[in-house]
Amino acid sequence: MAVARLAAVAAWVPCRSWGWAAVPFGPHRGLSVLLARIPQRAPRWLPACRQKTSLSFLNRPDLPNLAYKKLKGKSPGIIFIPGYLSYMNGTKALAIEEFCKSLGHACIRFDYSGVGSSDGNSEESTLGKWRKDVLSIIDDLADGPQILVGSSLGGWLMLHAAIARPEKVVALIGVATAADTLVTKFNQLPVELKKEVEMKGVWSMPSKYSEEGVYNVQYSFIKEAEHHCLLHSPIPVNCPIRLLHGMKDDIVPWHTSMQVADRVLSTDVDVILRKHSDHRMREKADIQLLVYTIDDLIDKLSTIVN
C-alpha cells in the first residue's frame, strides 16, 4: 500500500527556483511528512533549477585521474555511482545533487576511469578498476558518513564499497541493482555464441538504451567481473538498504533486487517495486521516489545519531 501511495503522489521536494512555497522541514524530515504535503502547483522540471558545480579532477598516482563534481554540505553526504559506461550528468545524478543542495547536504558525482571526462581507455576498463574508482572517491573526497546511491551496475559496486568501507558507508540505495547481472546474462548464452564472443573479444549485447542498439562489452570485462560476483554467498553488509526496481526492467530482472535483499546480512532492507517503470527509472515519479527515499534515510540516520 505504501508503494502505491508513493507512486501516486505528484509532489516534489523543491529547490528555491521552482517557485514553490518553502517546505518547512523539522528536525525529522521523514517520508511521511513529505507525503502529507500537497504542492500549490506542479514544479518545473529539473533543468529549470540547475545551478552548475565546477568540474574537478582527482589525481591518483599510477591510476587514471577521475572527473568529479562535489557539492559541499553537511553529513551524511550522498555519492552517486553510475551504471555501465554512464556519465555523471544523467537525470538521476543531477536530481540528487539538486535535492542535496536544497537540504544543505554534501553530494559527489563522478565518471569512472575511461568514461566521460575521466582519464583512461574504456576498452581497458574492468569492474575491479571501477571498484577502485569508487573507493578512491570515498577515501579521498568524501568527508564523514556517506549514503551511496548505485544505479544498475553502480548498485553492484555500491555493495562492494559497503563491504570495503563499513565505517564510512552508512546506507545504500540501489536503483535497478545489477549485482552479478552481466556475468549471469553472459553465462546464459548458447555455448556457440559464448565461444564466438571469446574469439572476437567483444560481446555485442543488444540494448534499446544504446544509440547503436548494442553495448559492446569487452570479453575481458566479463571474465574479470566473475571475480566480483556476490550472490553466491551471504553479503556482509549491515547498514540500512533500500532497493528500487521497475517491474518493466528488461535488462536487470527485478528478482535480482530480491536476491540482494535475501543475501545481505542487514535486517533493515526494503525492496520497492514500481509496476510500470523500466530499467532506467528516470521518469518524474521514479525520481520523486528516489529523492523521497534519500530524505527518509537521512532522517532515519539523524534519529539514530541523536
Curated annotation (Swiss-Prot):
UniProt keyword annotations, A-Z: Hydrolase, Mitochondrion, Transit peptide
Residues of the signal peptide: none
InterPro entries attached to this UniProt entry: AB_hydrolase_1, AB_hydrolase_fold, ABHD10_acyl-thioesterase
Transit peptide: 1-52
One GO term describing the cellular component: mitochondrion
Catalytic reaction(s) noted: S-hexadecanoyl-L-cysteinyl-[protein] + H2O = L-cysteinyl-[protein] + hexadecanoate + H(+); mycophenolic acid O-acyl-beta-D-glucuronide + H2O = mycophenolate + D-glucuronate + H(+)
GO BP terms in the entry: protein depalmitoylation; xenobiotic metabolic process
EC number(s) given by UniProt: 3.1.2.22, 3.1.1.93
Cell compartments where the protein resides: Mitochondrion
MF GO annotations: hydrolase activity, hydrolyzing O-glycosyl compounds; mycophenolic acid acyl-glucuronide esterase activity; palmitoyl-(protein) hydrolase activity
Top enzyme class: hydrolase
Activity modulation comment: Inhibited by palmostatin-B.
Pfam families referenced in this protein's UniProt entry, alphabetically: Abhydrolase_1
Family: Belongs to the AB hydrolase superfamily.
Role noted for this protein: Acts as an acyl-protein thioesterase that hydrolyzes fatty acids from acylated residues in proteins. Regulates the mitochondrial S-depalmitoylation of the nucleophilic active site residue of peroxiredoxin-5/PRDX5, a key antioxidant protein, therefore modulating mitochondrial antioxidant ability. Also catalyzes the deglucuronidation of mycophenolic acid acyl-glucuronide, an active metabolite of the immunosuppressant drug mycophenolate.
Name this protein carries in UniProt: Palmitoyl-protein thioesterase ABHD10, mitochondrial
Organism from which the protein derives: Homo sapiens
